[in-house]
Amino acid sequence: MDTSQLKNMVRVGIVSSVNGPACTARVTFPDKDNMVSAELPVLQLGSYGTKGYCVPEVNTKVVCLFLPNPSGNGMNAGFIIGAYYSGDKPPAESDASVRSVRFPDGSLIQYDDGTITISAAKKIVLKAPVININ
Protein backbone atom coordinates (compact mmCIF):
# COMPACT_ATOMS: atom_id res chain seq x y z
CA MET A 1 0.00 0.00 0.00
CA ASP A 2 1.49 3.35 -1.00
CA THR A 3 1.39 6.55 1.08
CA SER A 4 -1.39 8.17 -0.99
CA GLN A 5 -3.66 5.21 -0.18
CA LEU A 6 -2.81 5.55 3.52
CA LYS A 7 -3.55 9.30 3.46
CA ASN A 8 -7.01 8.65 2.04
CA MET A 9 -8.02 5.79 4.37
CA VAL A 10 -9.25 8.10 7.15
CA ARG A 11 -10.90 11.35 6.07
CA VAL A 12 -12.82 14.11 7.81
CA GLY A 13 -15.76 15.67 6.01
CA ILE A 14 -19.23 17.19 6.26
CA VAL A 15 -22.48 15.31 5.59
CA SER A 16 -24.04 16.78 2.44
CA SER A 17 -27.05 14.46 2.00
CA VAL A 18 -28.74 11.63 3.85
CA ASN A 19 -30.64 8.53 2.69
CA GLY A 20 -32.60 7.59 5.82
CA PRO A 21 -34.13 4.30 4.60
CA ALA A 22 -30.72 3.00 3.50
CA CYS A 23 -28.92 4.44 6.57
CA THR A 24 -26.31 6.03 4.29
CA ALA A 25 -25.02 9.54 3.67
CA ARG A 26 -22.86 11.41 1.20
CA VAL A 27 -19.93 13.36 2.59
CA THR A 28 -18.22 16.45 1.17
CA PHE A 29 -14.48 16.76 1.74
CA PRO A 30 -13.44 20.45 1.82
CA ASP A 31 -9.74 19.52 1.74
CA LYS A 32 -10.31 17.61 -1.52
CA ASP A 33 -11.81 20.50 -3.55
CA ASN A 34 -15.26 19.71 -2.08
CA MET A 35 -15.28 16.24 -3.59
CA VAL A 36 -18.48 14.35 -2.66
CA SER A 37 -18.38 10.65 -1.74
CA ALA A 38 -20.74 7.97 -2.90
CA GLU A 39 -23.45 6.99 -0.41
CA LEU A 40 -21.54 5.59 2.57
CA PRO A 41 -23.06 3.28 5.20
CA VAL A 42 -23.25 4.79 8.69
CA LEU A 43 -21.93 2.52 11.46
CA GLN A 44 -24.61 1.61 14.02
CA LEU A 45 -24.78 -0.02 17.46
CA GLY A 46 -26.39 -3.10 15.92
CA SER A 47 -27.73 -4.21 12.54
CA TYR A 48 -28.96 -7.78 12.91
CA GLY A 49 -31.26 -8.88 15.76
CA THR A 50 -30.96 -5.81 17.96
CA LYS A 51 -30.78 -2.80 15.68
CA GLY A 52 -29.57 0.72 16.29
CA TYR A 53 -30.54 3.63 14.08
CA CYS A 54 -28.97 7.06 14.09
CA VAL A 55 -28.18 8.82 10.83
CA PRO A 56 -26.23 12.10 11.00
CA GLU A 57 -27.94 15.29 9.92
CA VAL A 58 -26.78 17.34 6.92
CA ASN A 59 -23.84 19.59 7.92
CA THR A 60 -22.64 17.18 10.64
CA LYS A 61 -18.85 16.82 10.78
CA VAL A 62 -17.92 13.14 10.44
CA VAL A 63 -14.94 10.81 10.26
CA CYS A 64 -14.90 8.32 7.38
CA LEU A 65 -12.88 5.15 6.95
CA PHE A 66 -12.17 4.01 3.39
CA LEU A 67 -11.11 0.51 2.47
CA PRO A 68 -7.81 -0.18 0.72
CA ASN A 69 -8.35 0.28 -2.97
CA PRO A 70 -7.25 -2.76 -4.99
CA SER A 71 -10.50 -2.69 -7.03
CA GLY A 72 -10.27 0.97 -8.05
CA ASN A 73 -13.35 2.08 -6.05
CA GLY A 74 -11.45 4.97 -4.48
CA MET A 75 -13.47 6.92 -1.97
CA ASN A 76 -16.65 5.01 -2.82
CA ALA A 77 -15.85 1.95 -0.68
CA GLY A 78 -16.01 3.07 2.91
CA PHE A 79 -18.06 3.89 6.01
CA ILE A 80 -18.99 6.85 8.17
CA ILE A 81 -17.57 5.76 11.51
CA GLY A 82 -18.81 8.65 13.63
CA ALA A 83 -19.49 12.32 14.21
CA TYR A 84 -17.47 14.65 16.41
CA TYR A 85 -17.90 17.93 18.25
CA SER A 86 -16.05 21.09 17.30
CA GLY A 87 -15.86 24.68 18.52
CA ASP A 88 -18.90 25.84 16.56
CA LYS A 89 -21.04 22.89 17.77
CA PRO A 90 -19.95 21.98 21.34
CA PRO A 91 -21.27 18.97 23.31
CA ALA A 92 -24.69 19.30 24.95
CA GLU A 93 -23.28 17.95 28.25
CA SER A 94 -20.14 18.74 30.23
CA ASP A 95 -20.21 15.88 32.79
CA ALA A 96 -18.40 12.80 31.43
CA SER A 97 -20.61 10.48 33.52
CA VAL A 98 -23.84 11.66 31.83
CA ARG A 99 -25.20 9.80 28.80
CA SER A 100 -27.78 11.70 26.79
CA VAL A 101 -29.47 12.26 23.48
CA ARG A 102 -30.78 15.78 22.86
CA PHE A 103 -33.01 16.44 19.87
CA PRO A 104 -33.45 19.68 17.90
CA ASP A 105 -37.02 20.14 19.23
CA GLY A 106 -35.74 20.18 22.83
CA SER A 107 -36.64 16.58 23.70
CA LEU A 108 -34.13 14.71 25.88
CA ILE A 109 -33.29 11.17 26.98
CA GLN A 110 -30.64 11.22 29.71
CA TYR A 111 -28.96 8.81 32.14
CA ASP A 112 -27.14 10.37 35.10
CA ASP A 113 -25.91 8.18 37.98
CA GLY A 114 -28.97 5.92 38.21
CA THR A 115 -31.49 8.59 37.23
CA ILE A 116 -33.13 8.42 33.82
CA THR A 117 -34.78 11.59 32.55
CA ILE A 118 -37.12 11.68 29.57
CA SER A 119 -38.44 15.04 28.40
CA ALA A 120 -40.60 15.32 25.30
CA ALA A 121 -41.48 18.45 23.34
CA LYS A 122 -44.87 16.95 22.41
CA LYS A 123 -45.93 13.67 24.05
CA ILE A 124 -44.59 10.40 25.44
CA VAL A 125 -46.12 7.13 24.22
CA LEU A 126 -45.64 3.92 26.23
CA LYS A 127 -46.89 0.62 24.77
CA ALA A 128 -46.72 -2.62 26.73
CA PRO A 129 -49.05 -5.34 28.04
CA VAL A 130 -48.14 -4.23 31.59
CA ILE A 131 -46.61 -0.95 32.78
CA ASN A 132 -45.41 -0.70 36.39
CA ILE A 133 -44.77 2.71 37.93
CA ASN A 134 -43.54 2.79 41.54
Predicted regions, residues:
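Mixed-charge, glycine-accented linear interaction segment located at domain edges/termini
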Residues: S119-N134
